[in-house]
Amino acid sequence: VDTFDVLRGKGCKNNNGVVEKQVHGYDTWERESLKNEENPAPQYNLTEKKILRKYVGGDECDTEIAFEGRLVGGCMDCLGNLTGTSFDKVKEFNERYAADGIIWFLESCDLNVFAIRRAMWQMDNAGWFKNVKGFLIGRPLCYGQEMMGLDQYRAVTGIAAKYNVPVIMDCDFGHLSPSMPIVSGAYTQVKVKDNDLSLNYRFC
């Protein structure tokens, strides 16, 4: 799916007055980009097979998963710095969309696994995860890193597990391409079957 098509509304359907658009993840991703000064816009170097990791309550599972809610999130490198500041309006957002519930999409760039855990702890203790219906976690730039027994998965599930909601990891967004079009603020229906992630956006 082309992100520009999503932004222009191409391929959307009207369902009883509500505009909807469904997007799917990809089969492969790139660990190392071929981008350089001579070739600033190369094709994706798709060398890795996508394998979604699914957790509920801290336990990994392999069942079909579905949940829905209002989608919000971003890069933890930035969000962690905003937590608890005058720019932190998450409490108001949570209250406004309490009936919908919240789906958090999160990814990281420069953070190592311990910094990811700290960012999750900060957001949790600030009340950001109130009304959470599920987590979508993109591939971190530190993919595959392990430090003192902590890896990218436990860095997240160690905090998210207590909410007993689905945590889908290694999703197709973040700093390791390709990325699914993410529409922050959209009401989103999430389905995970086998190794396929689909997001159905409802613009309402």
Region annotations inferred by a language model:
Residues I65, L71-V72, Y97-A99, K130, ...:
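A generic structural signal for short, non-catalytic loop/turn and secondary-structure boundary residues
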